[in-house]
């Protein structure tokens, strides 16, 4: 039976690291890579900088932002800021091959881990839904303003789909001058 196994599988990726699958032997405490996601165009994770920064929202809450860019990307580069913040769904800062083209052309990619998701637990989720939904929108706007203030970006494109599309529409209505461009996929 599986519960008698002497090894486990570990899956790992980051915004710069394609998915790695390890076998980890419990008794020996040793791991080995058994599978690595292949990128047909080639990929060197050492060419990228990853950062986790925190923006302070309207009520003092620290909002995490995950950022990836090429090491040679200048300050104030165009940025694509993604957000969701609904249904307790955490947006993992994992690898996506579809982002590489933008990042390799000098854009910054950022994920705003706003309230409504579960990134910081159940209270984080509860403080971004129903009567507290405005927190999600304010958190997202705060993240964009933080990226500008820290000279990470001047021009920010925002992106979200479904409930994230609602986030994009609300953020544009609340603070239209904060954003350069917006993509609201299937908003409701």
What name fits each language-model region?
Residues 26-30, 35-162, 167-170, 174:
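Cap/lid segment of the alpha/beta-hydrolase catalytic domain
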Residues 11, 83, 185:
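Conserved residues at the C-terminal ends of beta-strands
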Residues 4-17:
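Short beta-strand elements that form the blades of beta-propeller/WD-repeat-like
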Residues 177-187:
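A conserved short beta-strand
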Residues 16-24:
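Structural motif
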């Amino acid at each position: 039976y599986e519960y008698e196994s002497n090894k486990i599988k570990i899956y790992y990726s980051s915004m710069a690291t394609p998915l790695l699958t390890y076998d980890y032997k419990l008794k020996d405490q040793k791991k080995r890579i058994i599978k690595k996601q292949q990128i047909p165009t080639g990929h060197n994770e050492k060419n990228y900088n990853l950062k986790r920064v925190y923006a302070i929202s309207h009520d003092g809450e620290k909002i995490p932002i995950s950022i990836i860019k090429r090491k040679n990307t200048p300050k104030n580069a165009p940025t694509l800021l993604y957000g969701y913040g609904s249904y307790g769904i955490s947006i993992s800062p994992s690898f996506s091959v579809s982002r590489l083209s933008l990042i390799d052309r000098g854009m910054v990619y950022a994920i705003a881990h706003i309230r409504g998701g579960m990134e910081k637990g159940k209270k984080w989720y509860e403080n971004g839904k129903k009567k507290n939904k405005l927190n999600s929108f304010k958190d997202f706007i705060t993240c964009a303003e933080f990226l500008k203030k820290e000279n990470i970006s001047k021009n920010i494109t925002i992106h979200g789909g479904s409930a994230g599309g609602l986030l994009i529409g609300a953020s544009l209505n609340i603070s239209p001058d904060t954003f350069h461009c917006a993509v609201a996929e299937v908003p409701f």
